[in-house]
Amino acid sequence: MAENFVVVDGGVVAPKGFKANGHKDRKYGAALIYSETDAVAAGVFTTNKVFAHPVALSKDVLVNNSVFRAIVANSGNANCFTKGGMDDAKLLVKKAAELLNIPENQVLSASTGVIGRRMPMDIITTEVERAFENMSSENSNKNASAAIMTTDAFPKTIAVEFEVNGKSVRIGGIAKGAGMIAPNMLHATMLGFITTDIEISKEDLTNSLQKATDESFNNAVVDGDMSTNDTVYVLANAQSGVKYIDCKDKFDSALAYVSKELAKMIVSDGEGAKKLIEATVYGAETKEDAKKASMSIIRSLLLKTAVFGADPNWGRIAAAVGYSGAEMDMSNFDIIISDISLEKQAILVKSGEQIADCGTPELKLAEEIMKEDKIKIIVDLKMGSFENTAFGCDLGYDYVRINSEYTT
């Protein structure tokens, strides 16, 4: 049980009226997500000024259309910064629309992979055809998730369910991402595709997605690089018979949870990563300060390597907060290293005073905690009432190996 909803199986096909499938042959893959009835859609995208052709195409489609039925995505090629890239993006959409027998302007698209290389459209369209062949497969959600992987080590998927007046509402999602993760999506490569059977307006869905994204994907950092292709979509087809207006808080909470869990899976799968890091900053003067400080901790390469080496070098945490731009008083703040369940907590700095030093019980406890797969860093700035949690991972030898071998 998570708050007022439960986790269920099925990912993007858990909500009523959705089908999906994917196929991947070595380097290249494709995934399809399809609503059997008309749906509304919302999307958020990278703010990188160098952006991929499917980002440009789908932004335009979202603005100019109100009915959507499908998402098509390919892996192995980012379709970014290439001559003819927009034609290739449109051809990908056309192929999906033809197979699903729907208008092209009802299809959203996304790509992930190598930047600056022309799309091998004969291979990509063949993968779309293979994905379409078995949209009712028992493994359809898993296939779709696996098809969009590049350097990912595992598929990322989740679904939740909650009840409203005796009726069930479901939200399901898949995502990919392992490197180039430092999204900042408003209106890595990180892709997220979410489905729901709630009845909701485009405006409300957009607002809910933007809030969920800001709490989740925009708080996730693997290596600090912002991709040209970062994209998150939500399709809502109203098949549950439940209206958003009757469960606004429940839906927003559930969508935020799904988004956060997908974000955590992404950073847990950071290229070569072994450990998940959560950094929570309390007591900030503003929400912006809380985010600055927590993201600064997660972005710190020195902190990431310290976590990799299980070294509770809390000075790197203090330094990261200090240069973050957040208001703070170095004579009055706390630093704690904890396990993810908060059962074990090592207080390293209390009210600006050093507690942990060589040989102290606090430092020994911190060393023990740092050996775990998931750790939490807590900072209390004691300046106000705002807080934020950011997600990241350690940085080790394999990150260099993977990225030195992967053509970008």
Swiss-Prot record:
InterPro entries in UniProt: Arg_biosynth_ArgJ, ArgJ-like_dom_sf, ArgJ_beta_C
EC identifiers of the protein: 2.3.1.35
SUPFAM superfamilies (alphabetical): DmpA/ArgJ-like (SSF56266)
Gene3D superfamilies: arginine biosynthesis bifunctional protein suprefamily (3.30.2330.10), ArgJ beta chain, C-terminal domain (3.10.20.340), L-amino peptidase D-ALA esterase/amidase (3.60.70.12)
Subcellular location: Cytoplasm
Matches recorded under Pfam families: ArgJ
Binding positions for substrate per the UniProt entry: 150, 176, 189, 271, 403, 408
The protein's assembly and partners: Heterotetramer of two alpha and two beta chains.
UniProt name for this protein: Glutamate N-acetyltransferase
GO CC annotations, alphabetized: cytoplasm
PANTHER family assigned: ARGININE BIOSYNTHESIS BIFUNCTIONAL PROTEIN ARGJ (PTHR23100), ARGININE BIOSYNTHESIS BIFUNCTIONAL PROTEIN ARGJ, MITOCHONDRIAL (PTHR23100:SF0)
Site (Cleavage): 188-189
Record carries keyword Ribosomal protein: no
Annotated active site: 189 (nucleophile)
Positions bearing the site annotation: Involved in the stabilization of negative charge on the oxyanion by the formation of the oxyanion hole: 112-113
Main enzyme class: transferase
Gene from which the chain derives: argJ
Family indicated by similarity: Belongs to the ArgJ family.
MF-aspect GO terms: glutamate N-acetyltransferase activity; L-glutamate N-acetyltransferase activity
Function: Catalyzes the transfer of the acetyl group from N(2)-acetylornithine to glutamate, forming N-acetylglutamate and L-ornithine.
Record's catalysed reaction(s): N(2)-acetyl-L-ornithine + L-glutamate = N-acetyl-L-glutamate + L-ornithine
Keyword Amino-acid biosynthesis (UniProt): yes
An annotated GO BP: L-arginine biosynthetic process
Domain of life: Archaea
